[in-house]
């Protein structure tokens, strides 16, 4: 036991009437919604990097957090893990996520970093034996170190490609050893700053080959989890190749991997791409590649990825409605890829941020489930497209332009526009949130 969270009680569900800030008002893990426990719908995860590795810096200033585990030794990394599992237990968090660089100190060589990762994974495994918290997904940090400044899989230097591939292998091994449900790839440096020095064709081909190697290794070692790509349009790169759901799907189709890889979709990244979160979720579901989500929010005035904790349950309800329509999570879940503000220095701030985020998502899920169970929205959606269920409409899809023209002329088809009834549906939505 450490004393970092001393005095902070275990967070329990007390209901909407509670005035206890260290309690859940909406998140009741055992509440059954649409035949499934709330915990199993939401599958919350704590992000190791923002919660325990981020020092509180920004582009204009450095570290503001003074954590007792900050440093580059394995002993401090183990202390960080001990503190992390204490918070997981306080929250009753069912899952966590990590990058390799979050959990182990960087070595002077690849071999040393590999040994450090293996040792800390063993330590985390021991902590997991005494905890209910499991691993939602692992990933490799292929963007922070200067060696990755020109990318990892898309780097012009073959040695960086090799280092990156070896790193991913080790992280996949670690994820499998810890029983992870997924493995994530995020290409923060897989993009370009200027076209003047960029070979787009080569970089795409190398990225495709890299991903194929990941899929091949998954099958070779018998990893039963899902490989996930996380889209983001820019930041840190000027233009990232995994721009949004549609772009990544095109990439997967290009290399024949659309049946092997799904997506981890982040709210903040969707906003940066000029989309709503629910748009990206609905599109991924329609393409069969919805895997998991990173839950956070952006400051809409800032124009960059602020990674704040979710606070707007009507907005989140739109997202969870699309997840329910898609059948819910299988291996995926709700990872809080969110960080407290750099002025929020106290241990209590870290716990309460997660309490608020979990309550916001639970409230959103309940609203979405009420509307989904009511069925009114789906009835209206089906009615709008009912004409396509007729034999004539189905036959037309198997016809030709010439035959369709002949039918239009013969039957004197002259369609009248029909209302989309958007305002009615928005009013319906508001009744449930």
From Swiss-Prot:
What is the designated name of this protein?
A: Xylose isomerase
- Any idea which positions bind Mg(2+) 1? 230, 266, 294, 337
What gene name does this entry carry? xylA
Q: Which note does the record give on the cofactor?
A: Binds 2 magnesium ions per subunit.
> Matching PANTHER family, A to Z?
PTHR48408, XYLOSE ISOMERASE
Instruction: Please list the reactions this protein catalyses.
Output: alpha-D-xylose = alpha-D-xylulofuranose
| Listed EC numbers | 5.3.1.5
NCBIfam families for this protein: PRK05474.1, xylose_isom_A
Family of the protein in this entry = Belongs to the xylose isomerase family.
Identify the catalytic residues. Answer: 99, 102
An annotated GO BP: D-xylose metabolic process
Keyword annotations from UniProtKB, A to Z: Carbohydrate metabolism, Cytoplasm, Isomerase, Magnesium, Metal-binding, Xylose metabolism
| Lineage: superkingdom | Bacteria
Does Cytoplasm show up as a keyword for this record? yes
Checking InterPro entries in the record gives: Xyl_isomerase-like_sf, Xylose_isom_bac, Xylose_isomerase
The protein's matches in Gene3D superfamilies, at most eight in alphabetical order, are given as: Divalent-metal-dependent TIM barrel enzymes (3.20.20.150)
Q: Which GO terms describe its cellular component?
A: cytoplasm
List residues binding Mg(2+) 2.
Answer: 266, 269, 305, 307
Which SUPFAM superfamilies does this chain map to?
Xylose isomerase-like
Q: How does it assemble?
A: Homotetramer.
